[in-house]
């Protein structure tokens, strides 16, 4: 008998921390939204927040300044006086001008903070354009004419390492959102709106991009010149605050323009997003920021007029005169004109999908593309999709329609291949060559973390299910977890389930809709969302999912990009993604803004084995970035055994998905394969009986419809025609 147990039998001990108390994305906002940080960088940032300036060349004096705070053996009176003096100093410095604050952080400090947060800023221009800028910034003594030839040679003889070093930039990072007002002089009302939204600590992408877009002087040609807004390519993890990063500079720029030129009004910025859901989300976030600033942000809708055409009036009048009779008066003609032509949108920022704006500018492709001469900023959110073959022509048409000579472009995504970067560079260069401006605008690229990698704050699980029935069984085990080992992953609602095609999403939804008991809400807790639904249905499902009325949402890649569900606990890839980039975006729906505890489960079958390696590599890199200890989700033997995919197969997979799950298969062999991948637990006999029943009902309905029509020829004139008088 255990004596301790006997003596403490009346005492209730608290059990260890249960899984319910574990940190989950749905439990609330993370204390620190930053993904990458260390103690040294946090110490430097804290010094900047508290106003403690580190003077150059005075490192020896620094311990003496900190002595009062470290003197633990002094008397109470003396120490209190010294502490008060130390606390009063920052308040005096905070009252100083912004020009003094610019000298606070030297290049070593900037480099330390940026490197610790894994922020890499690169100048994407040619070396011939970069080196003259660097030469002007340096104050050098007079040189002889003989050495001028030697200046041109290093541009060709530089090694790759030296070229990378020449391109690296270390701008001043944003310490806190308060600096937007004190350091960069943004609109007072805009700064208040940011504070009201609860933004205090900037994420990595905000820490790096906001100073660049708001006029950072630390990397310019000289501090006396006006800062130049660059063109920007940004690759940052999902959920890191990219929307806020591009909205704040655009709104501030428009506010300044309105103060300077009140009479000029029109569309000054265009934000392009690949889906309606993402465009609507950007507008909702933008409306919170523009409140009280006088800036208007609008979502592009069907039939909306964005430009005024001279030939539109003539067309409407011609239509009205041809349709109306001679007796109609002029009032009806004017009514037709007002009905036929919508008023031009009075908005400063237009958020749109590519096709909607192209149709508006080209009158549904019946007229030449109109121009947007006032647009000074074009933002491509999820730029890798917008410049993919599916949207490329539409996006480039919008880009070309923005004809203002000082147009600045910024491209944002969590994944951006080298081909997309090259296309962006070539487009910007074409515009520069076509314009008559001699002024050169820099092109920078900012990368946070490892490029094209998944966020490190979520747990990945790659599960082999062998067959379609195995995947369905594994998914039901997630919905109804039984007693399991501590190492097993538990996924709690709300979560998303991704499928390859719309028919598969519908089939999976119909299979799972009764898996949640009626006591918990039943079938109303599971919904399906895809592009075949109407706009009203899609917005209603999104609203209910955000409100928490829907717990499980089955969808396609429609929701894989940009949508911010902050309380999502996990993602289930029921069908493997078409590429590693799609995987990064899918799993990025959880773990938003630094939230811990998100789970990403990916099921794969025998048919998926040739395509899994790219996903396994992304998971492996993410776990290395996280620095997890213990058992990994992807073992080394699995990485070594999975086959590599050829470029042709990768292209085919990206375009059509796994062949066995395609809906347009017609051959006998493909039909057999499709039967294997059917999402259903019904046996073949049950399906045959259901089909027979459906066929009998359809035949009976047809006989009823054909009965009266078939009797007419027989009855004809032989029937009784009534009493004739």
From Swiss-Prot:
The EC number(s) this enzyme carries: 3.6.4.13
Main location: nucleus
Reaction equations catalysed: ATP + H2O = ADP + phosphate + H(+)
Compartments where found: Nucleus, Nucleolus
Biased composition (Acidic residues): 309-332
Subunit details: Interacts with the U3 snoRNA and is associated with the 90S and 40S pre-ribosomes.
Function of the molecule: ATP-dependent RNA helicase involved in 40S ribosomal subunit biogenesis. Required for the processing and cleavage of 35S pre-rRNA at sites A0, A1, and A2, leading to mature 18S rRNA.
Swiss-Prot/TrEMBL domain comment: The Q motif is unique to and characteristic of the DEAD box family of RNA helicases and controls ATP binding and hydrolysis.
The protein's name: ATP-dependent RNA helicase rok1
Organism, as annotated: Aspergillus oryzae (strain ATCC 42149 / RIB 40) (Yellow koji mold)
């Amino acid at each position: 008998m255990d004596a301790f147990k006997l003596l403490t039998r009346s005492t209730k001990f608290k059990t260890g921390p249960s899984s319910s108390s574990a940190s989950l994305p749905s439990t609330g906002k993370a204390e620190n939204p930053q993904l990458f940080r260390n103690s040294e960088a946090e110490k430097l940032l804290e010094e900047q927040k508290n106003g403690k300036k580190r003077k150059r060349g005075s490192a020896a004096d620094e311990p003496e300044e900190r002595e009062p705070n470290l003197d633990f053996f002094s008397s109470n009176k003396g120490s209190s006086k010294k502490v008060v003096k130390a606390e009063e100093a920052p308040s005096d410095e905070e009252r100083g001008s912004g020009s003094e604050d610019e000298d606070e952080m030297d290049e070593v400090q900037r480099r330390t903070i940026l490197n610790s947060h894994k922020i890499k800023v690169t100048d994407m221009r040619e070396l011939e354009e970069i080196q003259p800028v660097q030469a002007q910034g340096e104050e050098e003594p007079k040189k002889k004419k003989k050495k001028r030839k030697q200046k041109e040679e290093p541009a060709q003889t530089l090694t790759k390492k030296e070229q990378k070093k020449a391109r690296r930039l270390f701008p001043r990072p944003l310490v806190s959102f308060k600096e937007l007002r004190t350091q960069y002089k943004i609109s007072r009302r805009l700064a208040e709106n940011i504070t009201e939204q609860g933004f205090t600590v900037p994420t990595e992408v905000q820490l790096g991009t906001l100073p660049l877009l708001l006029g950072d002087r630390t990397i310019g040609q000289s501090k006396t010149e006006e800062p130049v807004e660059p063109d920007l390519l940004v690759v940052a993890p999902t959920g890191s605050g990219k929307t806020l990063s591009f909205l704040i500079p655009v709104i501030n720029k428009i506010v300044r323009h309105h103060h300077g030129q009140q009479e000029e009004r029109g569309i000054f910025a265009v934000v392009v997003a690949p889906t309606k859901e993402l465009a609507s989300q950007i507008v909702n976030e933008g409306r919170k920021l523009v409140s009280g600033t006088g800036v208007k942000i609008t979502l592009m809708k069907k039939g909306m007029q964005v430009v005024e055409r001279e030939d539109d009036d003539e067309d409407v009048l011609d239509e009205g005169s041809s349709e109306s009779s001679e007796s109609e008066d002029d009032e009806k003609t004017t009514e037709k004109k007002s009905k036929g032509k919508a008023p031009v949108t009075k908005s400063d920022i237009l958020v749109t999908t590519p096709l909607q704006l192209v149709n508006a500018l080209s009158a549904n492709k019946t007229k030449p593309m109109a121009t947007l001469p006032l647009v000074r900023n074009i933002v491509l959110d999820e730029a890798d999709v917008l410049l993919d073959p599916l949207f490329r022509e539409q996006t480039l048409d919008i880009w070309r329609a923005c004809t203002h000579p000082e147009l600045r472009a910024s491209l944002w995504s969590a994944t951006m291949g080298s081909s997309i970067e090259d296309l962006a560079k070539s487009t910007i260069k074409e515009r520069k060559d076509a314009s008559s401006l001699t002024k050169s605008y820099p092109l920078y690229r900012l990368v946070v973390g490892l490029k094209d990698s998944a966020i490190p704050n979520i747990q990945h699980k790659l599960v082999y299910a062998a067959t379609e029935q195995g995947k369905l069984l594994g998914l039901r085990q997630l919905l109804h977890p039984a007693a399991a080992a501590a190492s097993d992953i538990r996924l709690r609602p709300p979560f998303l389930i991704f499928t390859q095609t719309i028919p598969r999403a519908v089939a999976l939804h119909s299979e799972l809709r009764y898996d949640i008991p009626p006591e918990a809400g039943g079938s109303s807790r599971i919904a399906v969302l895809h592009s075949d639904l109407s706009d009203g249905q899609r917005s209603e499902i999104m609203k209910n999912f955000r409100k928490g009325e829907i717990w499980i949402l089955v969808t396609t890649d429609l929701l894989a990009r940009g949508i911010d569900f902050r309380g999502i606990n996990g993602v289930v890839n029921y069908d493997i993604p078409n590429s590693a980039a799609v995987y990064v975006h899918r799993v990025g729906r959880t773990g938003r803004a630094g939230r811990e505890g998100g789970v990403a489960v990916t099921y794969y079958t025998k048919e998926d084995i040739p395509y899994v390696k790219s996903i396994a590599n992304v998971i492996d890199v993410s776990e290395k970035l996280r620095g997890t200890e213990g058992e990994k989700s992807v073992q080394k033997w699995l990485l070594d055994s999975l086959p590599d995919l050829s470029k042709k197969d990768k292209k085919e997979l990206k375009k059509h998905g796994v062949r066995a799950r395609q809906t347009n298969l017609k051959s006998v062999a493909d039909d057999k394969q499709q039967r294997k991948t059917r999402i259903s637990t019904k046996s073949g006999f049950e399906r045959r009986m259901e089909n027979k029943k459906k066929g009998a009902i359809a035949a009976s309905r047809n006989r009823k419809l054909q009965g009266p029509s078939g009797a007419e020829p027989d009855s004809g004139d032989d029937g009784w025609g009534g009493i004739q008088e």
